[in-house]
Amino acid sequence: MIQMQTNLEVADNSGARRVMCIKVLGGAGRRYASVGDVIVVSVKEAIPRGRVKKGDVLRAVVVRVNQNLKRKDGSVIRFDKNAAVIVNKQSEPVGTRIFGPVPRELRAKNHMKIISLAPEVL
């Protein structure tokens, strides 16, 4: 579960290293985001000469959550850290590479470009 003030790692090569959630999109009083949800983030740490800079306010798709993720077949998947991929207004990734595995729940949320760039889909 991702909520406001949650710090996330960035799982792409957009130039950001760490971001903080400042808003969960999708409804007036929505509090939590999970895998595949779009959030508004602020860049807290970035590498030099990257596409994004520290302080930028951007959109991101949550790709990994620390909380257990239950599936229809009864299995559970869990990641070590919370991670997101920076996207533009059309939900296309800003970076050209994705690092680490992503869950197949992203397919149901129509983030096919992220799935195609990911090295492993769990």
UniProtKB/Swiss-Prot annotation:
RNA-binding keyword on record: yes
Pfam families reported in the protein's UniProt record: Ribosomal_L14
UniProt cross-references to NCBIfam families, sorted A to Z: rplN_bact (TIGR01067)
Lineage top rank: taxon: Bacteria
Its biological purpose: Binds to 23S rRNA. Forms part of two intersubunit bridges in the 70S ribosome.
InterPro entries: Ribosomal_uL14 (IPR000218), Ribosomal_uL14_bac-type (IPR005745), Ribosomal_uL14_CS (IPR019972), Ribosomal_uL14_sf (IPR036853)
Family label: Belongs to the universal ribosomal protein uL14 family.
Disulphide linkage map: none
SMART domains assigned to the protein according to its UniProt record, in alphabetical order: Ribosomal_L14 (SM01374)
A GO BP annotation: translation
Alphabetic keyword roster: Ribonucleoprotein, Ribosomal protein, RNA-binding, rRNA-binding
PANTHER family: 50S/60S RIBOSOMAL PROTEIN L14/L23, LARGE RIBOSOMAL SUBUNIT PROTEIN UL14M
Alphabetized GO MF terms: large ribosomal subunit rRNA binding; structural constituent of ribosome
Protein name: Large ribosomal subunit protein uL14
Record note on quaternary structure: Part of the 50S ribosomal subunit. Forms a cluster with proteins L3 and L19. In the 70S ribosome, L14 and L19 interact and together make contacts with the 16S rRNA in bridges B5 and B8.
GO cellular component: cytosolic large ribosomal subunit
